Amino acid sequence: MDQPEKPTSRREFIKQATGAFAGMALANTLAQATVFNAHSAVYALPLGVCTTYDKAGLLKRLGYSFVEESVGKFLIPDAGDEQYAKNRLALKAEAVPVRSYIYFFPGNLKSVGPDLHHEAILQRADLALRRAKECGSQNIVFGSGGSRSIPDGFDRAKAKAQHIELCQKMAPLAEKHGVTLAVEPLNRSETNFINSLAEGVEIIQAVNNPWFKLQCDIYHMLKDDESPDEIVKYSDYITHCHIAEKRNRTAPGVEGDDFKPYFRALKKIKYQGGLSLECRWKDFDQEITRGFEVVKKQLAEV
């Protein structure tokens, strides 16, 4: 029978984990530096998948560079601090970076409307950003469409002012912890506020903090017929990207969508950040394998 492991002291854990996460940050930097040469005919990006971290080993074997996890599962899990500590141990063991996070906060924490929860949101943001830094991560995606949906009959200008006020308080937290917040425009079927890159940039310009930037989700752009030219127009703000097919949010390769117009725009602006598959899955293993091949091929063709 295996002997039980000796419990690791908090000091020992922090010492061991810090070294591991520093190594992953360096690996991230090297991958980003080598993946795209502006003078090369072949365009490539670090690819990841929005999924749970237990899939990290599989993603690594397939050629993916990172996992994109969930704030509510990885950084602030329902099971509490003990589960977060286990998540960090898994991160150290697999050594596959968690570059970014989705599901920042739930829809019942409202950023706009008559009943605000700004203080609770800021407390959650501070904890999530601190832990993201501990994990060597670069971004937290600020989508949370339910939270920012404007209630029927509520003044839109007032809602926008409320949201900007919250973001102006949140951006210094991102700066303090050294983790970028990426505002994510969502298609109109998911929320009625911040539906385009232009609308996202309005918020970013009002906040005016370099740690508060823009998420470019090609799926949402496709759903609302948003032109790839918008990527070029707002290139200075884009820090991270997502992708899925238009009709059913399937993985690239399931229905055969052509993403090359959007990839050309990313290449034109010399984008070198991450690109994550955020999809609905039927056969995860098969679809991430095919998705990697399709995205890599289409990137190389632009």
Region annotations inferred by a language model:
Residues 70-92, 144-151:
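Glycine-rich, proline-tolerant flexible connector loops at the mouths of alpha/beta enzymes
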Residues 51-55, 71-73, 104-107, 146-148, ...:
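Active-site-proximal loop/turn and secondary-structure-junction residues that shape catalytic pockets
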